């Protein structure tokens, strides 16, 4: 007879924490481009699947980004601040692009399940 393992269920992550971990995973996988110019270049070259902005990004930066790449790829605001995201990027960055299709899909799904 097989032995049953009654391990306690892992608690679910908060949506913002799950998104933070997904962005961190993108960085570790080498599928995260950071900074306005690098993101714009990745989008123009067709490498970016998703573009995300920090919640405290400058409105002018977001406007410039939408004007430059808004018709080529989705630009979605994240509920995470630049200070929180600095733990991933080592410096405050407002604009991120995901260059892997499956990781972009993961981040996209988490963006729409997290409270904004």
List the model feature ranges, each with a label.
Residues 17-50:
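N-terminal first-folded block
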Residues 52-54, 97:
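Conserved beta-strand segments of the P-loop GTPase G domain that flank and frequently precede/overlap
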Residues 72-111:
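Short basic, glycine-rich beta-strand/loop surfaces that mediate nucleic-acid
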């Amino acid at each position: 007879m097989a032995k049953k393992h009654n391990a306690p269920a892992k608690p679910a992550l908060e949506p913002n924490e799950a998104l933070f971990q997904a962005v961190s995973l993108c960085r570790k996988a080498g599928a995260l481009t950071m900074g306005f110019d690098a993101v714009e270049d990745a989008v123009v070259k067709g490498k970016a699947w998703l573009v995300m902005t920090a919640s405290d990004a400058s409105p002018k930066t977001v406007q410039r980004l939408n004007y430059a790449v808004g018709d080529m790829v989705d630009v979605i605001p994240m509920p995470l601040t630049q200070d929180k995201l600095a733990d991933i990027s080592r410096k405050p960055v407002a604009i991120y692009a995901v260059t892997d299709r499956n990781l972009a899909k993961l981040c996209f799904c988490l963006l729409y399940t997290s409270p904004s």
